[in-house]
Amino acid sequence: MAINIEIKDRTENPIYVQVRQQIETHIRNKTVTSGESLPTPAALGQQLSVDKGEIQRAYYELEQLGLINKHTGKDFLGKPKIEYRVK
């Protein structure tokens, strides 16, 4: 899933707040639909050239707001795999 997020350097809001607000807007505007997977924190962090910890914090806050769910499963090698999906 590709979502359009822009990070602004000259703002009072930290990066994780900018990410959270923009994803929240996409969810509320139905740009992303219920059940749709979000990019992993590592993938989105790389796409935006920011630390994945910023994305993890944004996802955590979205989860606390009840907008996304965190799903833990296993990949084809049996390693733990975490997915974030829109509620």
Describe each PLM feature range.
Residues 30, 35, 66, 73-75:
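Glycine-centered flexibility sites
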